[in-house]
Design a protein with these regions (language model features):
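Basic, often amphipathic N-terminal segments
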Residues: 1-69, 91-149
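Long, low-complexity, Ser/Thr/Gly/Pro-rich intrinsically disordered segments that act as flexible linkers
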Residues: 76-77
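Short, low-order "capping/linker" segments at domain edges
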Residues: 82-94
Length: 150
C-alpha cells in the first residue's frame, strides 16, 4: 500500500503536533508519539506491487499539484479507535482528491482504496489512534478544551 499525503507549514504543524502530544499525555496512549507519526492528511491509498508502477503517475502529478489553503474547523471520531481534526472540504481539497484519483485510478494492476475516491474521501488529520473507548472520551475532552478553528 502506498499513501499520498499532505504535510503542513511549520505553524500549522506545530499546532497539530501540540494536539497530538496533549492527547498522548492525557490518555496515556502514545501510539502517535512513539511511532513519530507527523501531522499529515492522506489524500490517497493505492495498492500496487511496486513503487515503479506508480512512478509515471507521481511524476505527472508533481508538475500539476500546488499548495493550497486549508481551514480546520471541527473534530471527529472514526469509531472505534481514531480521533481527528477535519477541514472544510473546499475547492482546493476537492480538486486535489480528483486529480490524484484521476492520475492513479486507471493504472494497470493497481487499486485505489474506496475510502480515498472522490466524493467518498473524508479529509482529516489523525490526532490519536488505537484509542480505547475510555481514551476516546478523554481525547474528545482534550480537543474540546484546546481546539479552536484555524
Amino acid at each position: 500500500m502506498y499513501l499520498i499525503s499532505l504535510y503542513f507549514d511549520e505553524k500549522t504543524n506545530r499546532l497539530l503536533q501540540r494536539y497530538i502530544d496533549k492527547i498522548a499525555q492525557q490518555t496515556g496512549n502514545t501510539f502517535m508519539t512513539e511511532h513519530q507519526v507527523p501531522p499529515h492528511m492522506t489524500v490517497s491509498a493505492v495498492e500496487a506491487r511496486s513503487a515503479e508502477q506508480l512512478r509515471p503517475a507521481f511524476e505527472d502529478l508533481c508538475g500539476r499539484l500546488s499548495q493550497g489553503r486549508i481551514r480546520f474547523v471541527s473534530i471527529g471520531q472514526l469509531l472505534p479507535y481514531v480521533m481527528y481534526v477535519t477541514p472544510v472540504l473546499n475547492e482546493y481539497l476537492q480538486e486535489l482528491s480528483r486529480s490524484v484519483y484521476d492520475a492513479m485510478g486507471d493504472l494497470p494492476e493497481t487499486r485505489v482504496s474506496n475510502y480515498y475516491r472522490p466524493f467518498s474521501w473524508l479529509p482529516h488529520v489523525t490526532m490519536g489512534k488505537t484509542l480505547s473507548k475510555e481514551q476516546m472520551a478523554v481525547a474528545f475532552g482534550v480537543l474540546q478544551e484546546v481546539f479552536v478553528p484555524f
